[in-house]
Curated annotation (Swiss-Prot):
GO CC annotations on file: cytoplasm; nucleus
Positions carrying Phosphoserine: 45
Pfam family, one: Globin
Phenotype upon loss of function: Reduced nitrogenase activity in root nodules.
Name recorded for this polypeptide: Leghemoglobin 8
Localisation per UniProt entry: Cytoplasm; Nucleus
GO terms, molecular function: heme binding; metal ion binding; oxygen binding; oxygen carrier activity
Known role: Leghemoglobin that reversibly binds oxygen O(2) through a pentacoordinated heme iron. In root nodules, facilitates the diffusion of oxygen to the bacteroids while preventing the bacterial nitrogenase from being inactivated by buffering dioxygen, nitric oxide and carbon monoxide, and promoting the formation of reactive oxygen species (ROS, e.g. H(2)O(2)). This role is essential for symbiotic nitrogen fixation (SNF).
Induction of its expression: Locally down-regulated by cadmium (Cd), thus leading to nodule inactivation and impaired biological nitrogen fixation (BNF).
Length: 147
């Protein structure tokens, strides 16, 4: 079964909720990542020389880009059934930063926990599944571009 219109709608509405508190949700997202994978701190230039996760324009911009790419993946999955990367350099950047498969799992977990917080009372298994499928499509495309 393909990505449904309802799944796309769920991702879009929770993406809008995420954007309402970009600062807070960005900090939460990276805090969860670093709790699970402390060594990943060095992969992010905006976190390298900080104690903990400090809000910054770079942190917000990167978090917004990650979540927006997942949202765009939902749109693509609904329209065409596949995810085509808009940025051909993503694979090379991930290789350069030393990203490996377990990092994708950590980011997925952080993304879902952050969206759960952003969605509040609208959180559901259906919403979780929509974000999971969209993220998995994006991750698969990034991994493919890394090979």
């Amino acid at each position: 079964m393909g990505f449904t219109e309802k799944q796309e709608s769920l991702v879009n509405s929770s993406w809008e909720s995420f954007k309402q508190n970009l600062s807070g949700y960005s900090v939460l997202f990276y805090t969860i990542i670093l709790e699970k994978a402390p060594a990943a701190k060095g992969m992010f230039s905006f976190l390298k020389d900080t104690t903990g996760v400090q809000d910054s324009p770079q942190l917000q911009a990167h978090a917004a880009k990650v979540f927006e790419m997942v949202r765009d993946s939902a749109v693509q999955l609904r329209a065409t059934g596949e995810v085509i990367l808009g940025d051909a350099t993503l694979g090379a950047i991930h290789i350069q930063k030393g990203v490996v498969d377990p990092h994708f799992v950590v980011v997925k977990e952080a993304l879902l926990k952050t969206i759960k917080e952003a969605a509040g009372g609208n959180w559901s298994e259906e919403l979780s599944t929509a974000w999971e499928v969209a993220y998995d499509g994006l991750a698969a495309s990034i991994k493919k571009s890394m090979s």
